[in-house]
Amino acid sequence: FVKNFIAIPDIISLLNMSSGFLAIIFAINENLVISSSLIILAVMFDSVDGWVARKTNRKDELEFGKNIDSLSDIISFGIAPAIFIYKSINATSNLLNLSSIIVCLLIVICGVLRLTRYNVIANKTKAKDFIGFPIPGIAIIIATFYLSGLFNTYIVLILSILISLLMISDVKYPKFSNTMLLYMCFICSTLLIFQIPIKIYTINIPAIIVLFCCLYYLLINVIKH
């Protein structure tokens, strides 16, 4: 049954999901560097599955591909970052532990709402912009923030709340079109996945570049809105 529906883009979506699942396992085992690299890998798989679907003229009348993509995204970009954040905080007080649980739950809830709304809108219109911050954004921001060497517990909690709320907001985010910027982020992400260190003191340069590009995309559209 499944082989009649699954196509190359779906395999890429499953690779996205697999990367997210492995990121969860490594985060639980407190190997956060590998976990963050796997989250970035999941984002890269997610960024190409749609492109492959268009290039292969994939027909998806039953919406099998769209559903498998959304289910993969909630694992890789909702649950994985939430568990990653919880394990990275290493709470030293009951209040901080409770705060981190609430924030992580907020990420998952807003992620599910964001993906559900996207699927509903995608069925009815061909929007030029994303409505609300795209869910892969929170994953790559958290992962690169951790790898950057600038990670801070309180900043990551505040940032997670902000991004979660922006995911379910009405702020419009344009779909990526700056090819040069995309190539730069792709190269830097590849360096991070393969753990190729390019540092100044303790600052990971590729991580900083990707992080700042994502934060710029996050905030500039809020200002414009």
Tell me the role of every PLM-derived stretch.
Residues 127-225:
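C-terminal membrane-associated helical module and adjoining short loops/tails
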Residues 1-47, 186, 196-225:
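Topogenic membrane-insertion module of multi-pass membrane proteins
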Residues 39-46, 106-114, 163-170, 213-217:
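Alpha-helical transmembrane segments of multi-pass membrane proteins
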Residues 1-11, 65-71, 123-131, 172-181:
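Short, amphipathic, aromatic/basic-enriched membrane-interface segments that mark the entry/exit
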